[in-house]
Amino acid sequence: MMELDLLTAISPIDGRYRGKAGALASYFSEFALIKYRVQVEIEYFITLCELPLPQLKTLDSSRFDSLRAIYQNFSEADAQRIKEIESVTNHDVKAVEYFIKEEFDKLGGLEEYKEFIHFGLTSQDINNTSIPLSIKEALEQVYYPLIEELIDQLNAYAEEWANIPMLAKTHGQPASPTRLGKEVMVFVYRLKRQLAMLKACPITAKFGGATGNYNAHNVAYPAYDWKAFGNKFVAEKLGLEREEYTTQISNYDNLGAIFDAMKRINTIMIDMNRDFWQYISMEYFKQKIKAGEVGSSAMPHKVNPIDFENAEGNLGVANAILEHLSNKLPISRLQRDLTDSTVLRNVGVPFGHIVIAIQSSLKGLRKLLLNETAIYEDLDNCWSVVAEAIQTILRREAYPHPYEALKALTRTNQAITETSIKEFIETLEVSEDIKKELRVITPHNYTGI
C-alpha cells in the first residue's frame, strides 16, 4: 500500500489542494475530532467537580489546569495512542475515555475520580458536542474571515467601477444599460444578506444521555437538576446551545439550516463566477498574465479564466455534499441508527471545497484588468436600448401609441444607430423642448439611479 502524502491522497482536498485547505485539518481531521472529544470529556469532568458531585468534592480545583493541559497540549502521539486503544476496543469514544484514564494515572492522585470520566454519557453526547464545536470554530476562524475578504474585494470593485456604464443583457440580449459597479454590488448585497442569515443559525448540541432523558444521571443522583446542568455546561464551557428534546442523537435540524445557508451562499458565488467568466469572454476584462504560465497544451495564445472555473466546480461539489448532509442528518430510525456517524465524518469535505473555491474566486478577481474600451464600444453599438427611455417620455406626454412606434423602429434586423434614433426623434409631433429632452438620451447616460 502506498504511503499517504500529497501525491497519494485520494481526495484532492488532502492532495493537490492541501496548500489551500490545510488549515481545516485543525477542525475536521481525525486528529481534530479526537482532540475535540478529549476537550469535551475533560470539561465535562471539571463541570461535575464544580457542581460538585459528593464523590468529587475532595478534588482540588488547583488541579483543573493540569487536566485541561491534557487537551490543550494534545499531540499526534496522543492521538496515535487513542487509535491503538481503539484497535482493541473497536470503539472510538471509549478509546478516548481509556486514554484520559491513563493520563489521570500519569498525573497521580486521581485514581478515585477516574470513573467519573464519561459518567452517565453515551458516545453521542461527546460526538454531538465535539462536531458542532468544530463547525463553530471553523466558521469563526476560517470561513467567515475568508468570505468577508471576498465581499470586501467585490465591494472595492463596486466602488471603483461605480460610474462605468455597461450594456445589460437579459436572455443574452441587449437590455437597458446599467453600471458595472452596481452589477458587482448585487453580489455584495446578496452575499451579505445570506451571510447574516448563516450567522443567525444557532449552533446546537445534543447532551442528555443514552436516549436523551438523563436516565443514568437521574438514577444515580436524583436530587440534581440535570437539564439545567446540561444547559449550563454546553453554553458556558462549549459556547453552544443544548437541544432540549432529543433521542440518542442530535436532531440535526439546526445543523441542516447551517448547511442550507452555506449552500445558498455557494449558489451566489457560482452565479458570480459565471458572470465574471462571461464578462471575460465578452472582453470586458482582460487577465493579468504571469510569466511562465501555460493556458493550453496546444494553443499558445490561451489565457483562460481558470480560477473562476475552478471555483465554480468546487462550489458545485460542496453543494452536492451539503445537500446530502442537510437532507440525511435529521432522519434517523426511532431513537437512532448509525447512518449519521459516517455521514458526519464528511462534514469537513464541503468546507474544504468552499475554502478552495473562495481562494480561487479571489485569485481570479485580483487578476482582472478592466477593458473600458470594449465596454464603451459594446454600449455605443446598441442605440436601440434608448427606445425604452423615449417611449416612456412619450407616454408621459400622452403621445399616441408610443410603444408601438418604437417597436416598429427598433424590433428589426437592421442596425439601430445614433443617427437613426435622432432622425426618428425629429419625426415626432412633439414640442421642441421634448425633442431636446429626447436628444440628450444616449446609451451611456441612460443608466438609471
Where are the regions a protein language model picked out?
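Catalytic-core signal marking the mid-to-C-terminal active-site face
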Residues: M2-E30, S66, V294-I449
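A helix-coil-helix interface module used to build multimeric assemblies
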Residues: M2-Y214, Y221-F233, G295, F308-N310, ...
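Generic, well-ordered alpha-helical scaffold segments in large soluble proteins
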Residues: E43-T47, F99, E103, A138, ...
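Proline-centered turn/helix-capping motifs that create local helix->coil transitions or kinks
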Residues: D105-E111, K199-P202, S281-Y284, N319-E323, ...
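Short amphipathic alpha-helical segments with heptad-repeat character
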Residues: K136-Y144, E148-I151, N155, M185-V188, ...
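Alpha-helical coiled-coil oligomerization motifs
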Residues: E159-A162, I203, W277, Y284, ...
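Glycine-rich anion/phosphate-binding loop at the beta-strand->alpha-helix junction
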Residues: Q194, E241, T247-R333
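Active-site-adjacent "gating/activation" loops or surface patches in catalytic cores
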Residues: Y224-Q248, Y252
